[in-house]
Amino acid sequence: PSIHMDVICSKLLQNIQFRNYFIDRYADLINTIWQQPRVVATGNSMTNEVAPWIPRHHTRWSGDMTTFNNTMTNMFNWNNNRIPGARNVVQSQFALTGQVTYTLDVQPAGAGRIHISTIEPSEVEYPWNGVYFKGVPVRITAVANPGYTFDHWSPNSLFASNNYSQDLNITPTVNAAFTAWFEG
């Protein structure tokens, strides 16, 4: 079965649209659910769920809370240290030339949101930073909240004057900040 999956994945990745989606989605997941604060919060939540049973487990199978807590800390550290390596594997595997950091912001605060690739960072996270791969197109869309309308994007290193298109299709080459301005 594994050999068939390898063939299927290999063929899918030959399709440039699928390849780009795969790479962008991978970046989106690293930029969101695999970030250290979320992993720690999820791990702590799960730890709190099982905490009442840990002493009983240790009585039966040996161990202690110090070892348990050290194991959790090691898991969190492994995740945090894994992120740069995971990005480098994608960059190497697909022969990409580098990574860029995009900063997204909304003005005025609370007037809208920004959708990037397959995610929409929470309003409480603005300004938001995410790492994407050079040469792989990324779609960025400004979305107005009720009572507001999109006005423009602030100039940045990728375009010199205000950009009035709500949707941007960017092929990353350099770090850039994207600030969506809304009126309302």
Which residues does each predicted region cover?
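Surface-exposed interfaces of beta-sheet-rich extracellular modules
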Residues: H58, P137-N163
